């Protein structure tokens, strides 16, 4: 028996430590290209507890049997998702948890991914909208101190515009960048 997969997106207040923020409104398009049902829920407050409550309520409303997350290195995120799943009696999956470098190499090779937020020393405004490719991974590893190539410690965020399981590529027509001198984000202003 398989699983019916639904893409659940929690729309947090800006600067969430738990959930992705830049370009979250475009997750609907990603779900469409993956052929998945899409559910989006706005967190009613700015604190972590508000975001987790939104997730918990959405999972209950959906009558979910499990929750899968893309956490790779963030104990912070994985522990909280596991806790919500446990409280609701759901199975928790993190299929790429502690994934090898091979998985990152495959993502770089087969996915079209863009850097949409930066917040670490060595990551400048010029990195925004840059393709997340092999050269970028090498750059991150060479920084002193090194930055995780998964960008999971709050160092940055990415947006996937194409993947082997997308029906067609999301063609980004325009970006709007904001940078305050030490961190910034690039929001998609439109798709072609």
Locate each region found by the language model:
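ATP/NTP-dependent adenylation/nucleotidyl-transfer catalytic domains that generate, transfer
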Residues: 30-39, 63-68, 80-89, 109-192
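ATP-dependent adenylation/nucleotidyltransferase module used to activate substrates
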Residues: 1-117
